[in-house]
């Protein structure tokens, strides 16, 4: 993409920490206190995430649209994949004028954006998440891109997880502990929940070791 450096991409290291949260709003305090929603593993969620390809959601007053452009296991075609690879695309409908300069001729030329029917400049970010985690925590690396902040990645990933819970209500529901009956169905009331994820930054182990063993030992 023309607005990015053609020779390198910044990559940051992170952790995805999985948990669950209630979707059902009207619950007795007893059910809220005793509800124990099982936390799915990423390996279990991976095929459901892949099924959400092409899902989009708008942010920043509808000026930035994030899309799950692609989602695949890595290595591709492996019977025992080790990672989940996601491609997030961002369409920026609020792009500014681009200036092209010719140093030889000492001229500048403006390229005015002409957005039609929701068009915008597009950026992309790859996310590689390990499928083997410990204590609900999964290592990940993210290729950085303009407009796609860590906070937006976390928000969009959780929006995808929410869509998964809506599309798979039987999988993400448990019986209420009080065994209350739903008056509309006559069946035991179900408590709906959703998987959620927190995106955390991680310590650079190489830098940490240098800080403790060499010339950076006084840095805190």
Indicate residue ranges for each PLM-predicted region.
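Terminal interaction module
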Residues: 1-105, 147-220
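Acidic/polar residues at beta-strand termini and the immediately following turn/coil
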Residues: 99-108, 130-134
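Well-ordered mid-protein domain cores that form the structural environment of catalytic cofactors
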Residues: 104-124
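Elongated alpha-helical scaffolds
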Residues: 118-143
């Amino acid at each position: 993409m023309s607005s990015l450096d053609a020779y390198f991409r910044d990559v940051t290291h992170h952790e995805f920490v999985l948990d669950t949260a209630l979707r059902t709003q009207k619950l007795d305090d007893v059910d809220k206190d005793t509800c124990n929603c099982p936390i799915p593993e990423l390996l279990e969620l991976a095929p459901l995430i892949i099924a959400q390809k092409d899902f989009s959601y708008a942010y920043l007053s509808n000026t930035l649209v994030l899309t799950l452009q692609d989602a695949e296991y890595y290595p591709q075609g492996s019977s025992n994949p080790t990672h989940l690879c996601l491609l997030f695309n961002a369409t920026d409908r609020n792009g500014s004028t681009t200036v092209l300069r010719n140093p030889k001729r000492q001229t500048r030329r403006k390229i005015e954006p002409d957005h039609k029917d929701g068009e915008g400049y597009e950026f992309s970010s790859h996310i590689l998440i390990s499928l083997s985690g410990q204590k609900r925590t999964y290592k990940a690396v993210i290729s950085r891109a303009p407009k796609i902040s860590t906070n937006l990645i976390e928000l969009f990933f959780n929006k995808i997880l929410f869509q998964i819970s809506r599309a798979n209500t039987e999988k993400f529901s448990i019986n209420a502990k009080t065994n209350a009956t739903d008056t509309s169905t006559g069946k035991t009331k179900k408590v709906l929940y959703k998987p959620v994820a927190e995106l955390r930054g991680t310590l650079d182990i190489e830098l940490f070791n240098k800080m403790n063993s060499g010339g950076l030992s006084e840095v805190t």
